């Protein structure tokens, strides 16, 4: 992580702070649960005069990480732990170990071809682009990718001795999604997907559909979730005296949301 702070500038009116960090991990817990993320924060504060201050803030974290499947049985990880939690013997499933991930599979034959992989670029966002794979010897069909920054301009004002106002103009949103499977994906004897067999079947048993040509029987798909919100929030507080105050509020926003698969 790197952080830069200017301190007070321009006769103690302006201060700027910026921070950025990078995090990567090949495996967090279960097989295929890697993490690849950036994060950033920027803040600029300017005192217009004794009664008015402006503040600009931007923060976000474009990230990509592999996931485990959400609906695994505890006995698939550990029979001992399952028994401690009250699972009956007849309900125990096959035990695969604590790093079990049914949606991640080690490839017997390295896959070196190009793939459509979600990647983020400034001013272009998340899109599936043809590129080298993250790994040529393992596939995890469950991946999550997001970048949903927050940008806001704040105005703090003392209107008079008894009235203050705080107003924020903001944007919140961005793009992201997750990957999964569509069609038929084969299973192996070890309780995980068999992507070697699925790739071989796609190559030998592609199905023809009118208007679409030959299609693979099992594929990886992406589910997108894009959203953007623009708004203004303002709070006016008035001191009425004798320990009594009145607060007025304004909240106006507009949002756009997209959900689709690709």
Model regions: which residues?
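Short, functional N-terminal and low-complexity linear motifs
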Residues: 5-12, 23, 117-121, 133-135, ...
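Outer-membrane beta-barrel proteins
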Residues: 23-49, 68-69, 121-156, 217-231
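A broad, low-specificity signal for short, low-complexity segments enriched in glycine/proline
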Residues: 3-4, 13-17, 113-115, 125-128, ...
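Sequence-level detector for tyrosine residue identity
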Residues: 34, 40-41, 46, 70, ...
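Face-selective signature of the C-terminal outer-membrane beta-barrel domain
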Residues: 146-262
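A surface-exposed, glycine/aromatic-enriched loop/edge motif typical of exported proteins
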Residues: 54-123, 172-207, 259-262
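Detector for Asparagine
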Residues: 5, 11, 43, 49-52, ...
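Transmembrane beta-barrel wall of Gram-negative outer-membrane proteins
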Residues: 1-25, 29-69, 77-109, 154
């Amino acid at each position: 992580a790197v952080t830069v702070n200017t301190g007070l500038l321009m006769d103690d009116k302006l201060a700027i702070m910026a921070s950025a960090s990078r995090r990567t991990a090949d495996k967090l817990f279960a097989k295929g649960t890697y993490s690849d993320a950036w994060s950033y924060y920027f803040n600029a504060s300017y005192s217009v005069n004794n009664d008015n201050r402006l503040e600009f803030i931007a923060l976000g974290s474009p990230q990509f990480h592999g996931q485990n499947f959400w609906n695994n049985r505890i006995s698939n990880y550990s029979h001992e732990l399952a028994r401690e939690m009250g699972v009956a013997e007849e309900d125990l499933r096959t035990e695969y170990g604590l790093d079990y991930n049914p949606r991640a599979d080690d490839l017997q034959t390295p896959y070196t071809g190009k793939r459509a992989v979600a990647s983020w670029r400034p001013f272009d966002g998340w899109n599936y682009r043809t590129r080298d794979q993250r790994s040529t010897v393992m596939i995890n069909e469950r991946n999550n990718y997001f970048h949903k920054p927050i940008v806001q301009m704040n105005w703090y004002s003392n209107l008079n001795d008894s009235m203050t106002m705080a107003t924020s103009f903001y944007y919140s949103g961005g793009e992201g999604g997750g990957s999964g499977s569509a069609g038929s994906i084969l299973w192996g004897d070890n309780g995980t997907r068999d992507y070697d067999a699925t790739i071989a079947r796609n190559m030998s048993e592609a199905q023809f559909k009118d208007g679409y040509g030959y299609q693979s029987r099992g594929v990886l798909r992406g589910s997108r979730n894009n959203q953007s919100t623009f708004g203004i929030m303002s709070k006016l507080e008035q001191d009425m005296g004798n320990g009594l105050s009145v607060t007025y509020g304004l909240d106006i926003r507009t949002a756009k949301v997209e959900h689709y698969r690709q």
